[in-house]
Swiss-Prot record:
It comes from Escherichia coli (strain K12). Its EC number is 2.3.1.-. This is Acetyltransferase YpeA. It comes from the Bacteria. The keyword Transcription regulation does not apply. Gene3D superfamilies: 3.40.630.30. GO terms for molecular function: acyltransferase activity, transferring groups other than amino-acyl groups. It is an enzyme of class 2 (transferase). Residues 1-141 form the N-acetyltransferase domain. Belongs to the acetyltransferase family. YpeA subfamily. NCBIfam families: PRK03624.1.
Length: 141
């Protein structure tokens, strides 16, 4: 397995993977999310590749206060092999190298499948309520 930075030629394969991993929501246009990321620090957008195929992704960010991880997903046939752990570990190292003191991951409360993994990796529940506001309306995906 190789972990590397996203490249333009990964575009369609990544969107297909996100569909397979059930990461897409009607209010988020994945093509626009990728385009925006490519225009704003693509070096934190990582893919895991096995035999030339993209089997995992994580899209990271850093705002000077904390890091974040989005679109963490691994192809169902490749789960349980440590790929998500490796992606997060690489992202964390990149964030630490930038002086980032902490990372945040938003997970639906009922997603028990991944909550255990995050806890094993040292992530803790934060007693906060996450609020959001759409600033630019995308076309429904």
């Amino acid at each position: 397995m190789e972990i590397r930075v996203f490249r333009q030629e990964d575009f369609e394969e990544v969107i297909t993977l996100w569909e397979r991993c059930d990461l897409l929501r009607p209010w988020n246009d994945p093509e626009m999310d990728i385009e925006r990321k490519m225009n704003h620090d693509v070096s934190l957008f990582l893919v895991a590749e096995v035999n030339g195929d993209v089997v995992g992704t994580v899209m990271g960010g850093y705002d000077g206060h904390r890091g974040s991880a989005y679109y963490l997903g691994v192809h169902p046939e490749f789960r349980g092999r440590g790929i998500a752990n490796a992606l997060l570990n690489r992202l964390e190292k990149k964030l630490i190298a930038r002086g980032c003191p902490k990372i945040q991951i938003n997970v639906p409360e009922d997603n028990d499948m991944v909550l255990g993994m995050y806890e094993r990796l040292g992530y803790e529940h934060a007693d906060v309520l996450s609020l959001g506001k759409r600033l630019i309306e995308d076309e429904e995906y």
